[in-house]
Amino acid sequence: MKADRATLEKLFSYPLDGWGCIEVEFEVTDMPGYENCWMGKMPDPEHQEQELFWFGLKPDGTEAWDYHSLFDFMSAPIFKGKTLCDISEKINVLSVDGTDPAERMQFYLYDRKDPIRFA
């Protein structure tokens, strides 16, 4: 599933309220070396009232970063000098929270101001 910048910003703006996490497996098309990557958001283990945004780009942990703000997370030049904003159109989401990305993204992207609709 492709994800653009607006989708990623909305996904990672979802309030965790001190519990749970968002975990995204992804690849970056046309950028060798970024085939099995992870990014996410969770409560900061040391300060549960704060959120921690993170990347894990290599399975061996050599390219792993934590950020305390969405701005820093989105604008860190960790993809060969490019930011998540720069490469957002190349992001292919493989899973969200270990499930089908199209299904799970609906939960995070749903506008909570809209009334709940039943089929």
Locate predicted features:
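Context-gated lysine
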Residues: 2, 10, 41, 58, ...
